[in-house]
Amino acid sequence: MQVILLDKVANLGSLGDQVNVKAGYARNFLVPQGKAVPATKKNVEFFEARRAELEAKLADVLTAAEARATKIKELGSVTIASKAGDEGKLFGSIGTRDIADAVTAAGVDIAKSEVRLPNGVLRTIGEHVVSFQVHSDVFAELNVVVVAEA
């Protein structure tokens, strides 16, 4: 199925590309999320007329994401208190939701889906480097300090 991309899609293309994808991927993911439209004659003409507007909108989103990434980097570190045993192991773990809540409380709005934990959830006290993907092209890193609750 031919579609026109309205946004940058990983491993597929960027704004304005006409790509061939499986029908189910287009119907169930790309079109409902507003990332693509079917490549009919009418849609191709409509897209070409609005191309500059869509590119400007995409640039604005990228600029906003870069500003959020800068705010995250300016935080330096975020401290999270959790119950822990004597050897420094946590009772439970600290996951993406806990980190997103702590960063949001520190003043930068972050969704839990933007938090990236490549080594899995945090299970020990100490400093951990956590990365955030605020846009498909924009990443930020932040130190998360896990301390034992008194």
Swiss-Prot record:
Cellular-component GO terms for this entry: ribonucleoprotein complex; ribosome
Family classification: Belongs to the bacterial ribosomal protein bL9 family.
Keyword Magnesium: no
NCBIfam families the UniProt entry points to: L9
Annotated keywords: Ribonucleoprotein, Ribosomal protein, RNA-binding, rRNA-binding
Extent of the signal sequence: none
SUPFAM superfamilies per UniProt: L9 N-domain-like (SSF55658), Ribosomal protein L9 C-domain (SSF55653)
Statement: the UniProt record of this protein carries the keyword RNA-binding: yes
Stated role: Binds to the 23S rRNA.
Molecular function in Gene Ontology: rRNA binding; structural constituent of ribosome
A Pfam family per the record: Ribosomal_L9_C
Gene Ontology BP annotations: translation
Annotated protein name in UniProt: Large ribosomal subunit protein bL9
Source organism of the structure: Pectobacterium atrosepticum (strain SCRI 1043 / ATCC BAA-672) (Erwinia carotovora subsp. atroseptica)
Lineage of the organism: Bacteria, Pseudomonadati, Pseudomonadota, Gammaproteobacteria, Enterobacterales
